[in-house]
C-alpha cells in the first residue's frame, strides 16, 4: 500500500463483516492511541505510520473466524497499547474483556481510552 492510499478503505475491504459503529470506534481508538503514544510509548513509534495496516489489521484478522457467545470472557495478557484487546472489545461488545499489563502507566492510559470509547473493559496490573 502506498502512502497516498486510504488505510481505512483497505481495512473495510479486508473486513467487510465489521459494522459501521465498530469502524467509528476503531477510528477513535487509533486517534487516541496516536495521541497518547506521543506521551508514553504504547506501540513502537516506528510503526505508527502503519498503525492501521500493520497492528489493527493483525488484530482484526481473527474476526473472520471467531464467534463469541454472549458474556464470553477474554483475557489479553501483555496488552501494551491495548492491542488486540481494545479492537476486539469494540468488535465483540457482547463479550467481557480483561486487559493485563505489568506497566501501571500503560494501564492508566488504557483506562482513559476505554472510558472515552464507552467500552466496558476491565484491567489488571500484573
Where do the protein language model's features map onto the residues?
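Class I SAM-dependent transferase core
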Residues: 2-70, 105, 112-119
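Conserved SAM/SAH cofactor-binding pocket of Class I
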Residues: 60-126
